[in-house]
Amino acid sequence: MKKQLYQLSNTDIAFPPIECALDSPDGLLAIGGDLSLARLSNAYNNGIFPWFSEDEPIMWWSPSERGIVELDNFHISKSLRKHLKKHPVTVTINNAFIEVIEACCEQRIDTDGTWITSDMLTAYINAHNAGIAHSVEVWREGELAGGLYGIMQNGVFCGESMFHHQTNCSKLAMWALVNWLKRHNAHFIDCQLENPYLMSLGATVIPRPAFLAKLHAAQNYKVDPAMWIPQELNAIYE
């Protein structure tokens, strides 16, 4: 199948075949369209995600290699366990989604710029209100110390971004997420791109066909949507 860049319609939410994604830049499949809930849901169901900067058109990607976290392979270091014992935290889900995504945006601006544009903020807040985007919050002494957010589709959590205001608190958010997903029969976490930080936590990289096969298999994982009712996660690190 010919590799070429497609221009999406504003009315048709369909995507071209993933096999058409470019080799350079790796995985770029299409531009344009919108960030409507229906299009976002269709994208994630097919292993596609949006990634672009404020001054760029909407760009849709499916890279040739995909970073994932197999839930049973998540790595917890001894130092992280010691840190948690010395500095306990409270973990919640969906209690502060807007604060989490805004903190992710601010942290990226402070480091290397951000792809969380104003349109992305609006789109993911809408997805949260519709029940498909979720957040994990880590609190210490009543302050939001770290967290992450992403999209849950069937048995796959598609991680979008994480942040920390205090040492190790993004790792603690990830650890809590992994344990919570395991409790509820989820399949794996899609990290989208290879990331040294996540690789240190046990993420691996697999080729696109293997990823798509796992994504398809995840449709058979029945996950109770009630797992995302806003709540405190008790004994989540046990």
UniProtKB/Swiss-Prot annotation:
InterPro entries assigned to the protein according to its UniProt record, in alphabetical order: Acyl_CoA_acyltransferase (IPR016181), Leu/Phe-tRNA_Trfase (IPR004616), Leu/Phe-tRNA_Trfase_C (IPR042203), Leu/Phe-tRNA_Trfase_N (IPR042221)
GO biological process, one term: protein catabolic process
GO CC terms: cytoplasm
Gene3D superfamilies: Leucyl/phenylalanyl-tRNA-protein transferase, C-terminal domain (3.40.630.70), Leucyl/phenylalanyl-tRNA-protein transferase, N-terminal domain (3.30.70.3550)
Enzyme Commission no: 2.3.2.6
Broad class of where this protein is predominantly found: cytoplasm
Keyword Transferase annotated: yes
The keyword Iron belongs to this UniProt entry's keyword annotation: no
Coiled-coil ranges per UniProt: none
Keywords: Acyltransferase, Cytoplasm, Transferase
GO MF annotations, alphabetized: leucyl-tRNA--protein transferase activity
Reactions mediated catalytically: N-terminal L-lysyl-[protein] + L-leucyl-tRNA(Leu) = N-terminal L-leucyl-L-lysyl-[protein] + tRNA(Leu) + H(+); N-terminal L-arginyl-[protein] + L-leucyl-tRNA(Leu) = N-terminal L-leucyl-L-arginyl-[protein] + tRNA(Leu) + H(+); L-phenylalanyl-tRNA(Phe) + an N-terminal L-alpha-aminoacyl-[protein] = an N-terminal L-phenylalanyl-L-alpha-aminoacyl-[protein] + tRNA(Phe)
Location(s) in or outside the cell: Cytoplasm
Source organism superkingdom: Bacteria
Protein family membership: Belongs to the L/F-transferase family.
Protein function: Functions in the N-end rule pathway of protein degradation where it conjugates Leu, Phe and, less efficiently, Met from aminoacyl-tRNAs to the N-termini of proteins containing an N-terminal arginine or lysine.
Protein's name according to its UniProt entry: Leucyl/phenylalanyl-tRNA--protein transferase
Origin organism lineage: Bacteria, Pseudomonadati, Pseudomonadota, Gammaproteobacteria, Alteromonadales
Chain's gene name: aat
